[in-house]
């Protein structure tokens, strides 16, 4: 990944308490996994920002290197990589996600 792409990702991850790199947008997710993440965050009423990786090939590849995680979507909370769709579902079901997000939004 080039330094410019890394700097863009750094800026997005640090500027937004909850940042989702996904396929599509909040209003029109382009894959089921991205849709799962959007639905969970919407259900919890959590404000979040997204970046459509389908519209940006450098970010689409760069985010995988950045997190050392091979799949999209990718969720960051307070600058920390949380995971993708499966991890978000698991954290939501066991109540950890709500707690993590409440702490993040309070900081």
Curated annotation (Swiss-Prot):
The keyword Iron applies. [2Fe-2S] cluster binds at residue 31. Keywords: 2Fe-2S, Iron, Iron-sulfur, Metal-binding, Redox-active center. Glutathione binds at residues 23, 60, 85-86. SUPFAM superfamilies: Thioredoxin-like. Residues 6-107 form the Glutaredoxin domain. Coiled coil: none annotated. It comes from the Bacteria. Signal peptide: none annotated. GO terms for molecular function: 2 iron, 2 sulfur cluster binding; disulfide oxidoreductase activity; metal ion binding. Belongs to the glutaredoxin family. Monothiol subfamily. This is Uncharacterized monothiol glutaredoxin ycf64-like. It comes from Synechocystis sp. (strain ATCC 27184 / PCC 6803 / Kazusa). The lineage of its organism: Bacteria, Bacillati, Cyanobacteriota, Cyanophyceae, Synechococcales.
